Amino acid sequence: MTFVVLLTSAAIRATPGVMIVPLEKEFGWSRAVISVAISVSLLLYGLIGPFAAGLVNRYGPRRVMALSAFLIGLGTLSTVTMKSPWQFIALWGVLVGCGTGITAIVLGATVVQRWFHVHRGLALGMLSASSATGQLIFLPILAQIVVTSGWRWAVVAVAAVALVISPIVFLVMRDRPQDKGLAPLGLPPGEPVPAPAVGGNPVVAALSALKMASRSREFWILAGSFFICGASTNGLVGTHLIPACMDHGIPEVQAAGLLAMMGIFDLIGTTGSGWLSDRFDNRLLLMTYYGLRGLSLLYLPYGFVSEGHGLSIFAVFYGLDWIATVPPTAALARQAFGAEKSPLVFGWIIAAHQVGAALAASSAGLLRTVEGNYDHAFLVAGFLCLFSAIGVLFAGKRPPAPVLSPQTG
């Protein structure tokens, strides 16, 4: 059920990519103005995450996810009546941003912490892959609806999904395995089930976690790398790739299909990343992911003008590590701050991710308005990813090598 809610939230976060050009044409709004609303939504998605972790500890995932789906559906549906940019900012930016923020990746980390004793990296990788799956399922359909029936019907479709899911989550989901007479997956027989976190004031809990984490070098390295991660994914490619494709004469449905193709490879890459994060040095994994992403973004401006399968090559290599950074980053946070505190700290790392996404979404929209293309935005993001590939090597310590007992004859 968590996967379904995160999938729906991810699909709605990706929807503006197919709305930018139709909104430009209908209302005459500039791409920079439209990007402001998207930036606000991305920013709130991140900033609410740490407090959402506190809400989950106090009220449980079931109530929190049901509320999130309702807010997402309400905010999305309300945009069909908007007439001016401030309404788009208030509805999509604020209301939808708050709703998706409650279902930030930190929610998946909290659920994994409760339901899994082993294979946590793999489980988080599968939940993180919901973003890829959301694009895979929804974006080509939404693009086709926009082309044939207009952007309003596309919005109604995703709003309906969210509003239907909300009561189902409330009625069906359970907060922890004990509620169903189960133990966390892989918990050894006879070992006591970890006590759930004590519910308290979510604001105090989130701010206390930030105060504690901010004294750590690992926090700033992980938050800084995730800032660049957000800028180079949700903020830039997730928001502006479809409009950039249309600038080069690629039809909207075909451009959405490119994102869906990336979603297929990201589903593979992120799930595989979760498996790898349980077994290998997570810093080396992050170095590989950011390096591959940086090279892909540096190639993208040339992919637009190359003949043949230039964009397909980009989609494969960029897609493989789009959200693959989540499991190793969460694992490093858990290693640095412990199982109990890491979900709240990871919430602040997600906040940094979305601050980067918001800045990239607005900056790329402004660059497109001023320069007429996105080339510099893609190139800057590529170099930042290469910088991050080096920086993550300084996070944490290498896991100690296993000590082998001498064999006796």
Segments (PLM) and residue ranges:
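Extracytoplasmic gate region of multi-pass secondary transporters
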Residues: P16-I20, K211-T271, A360
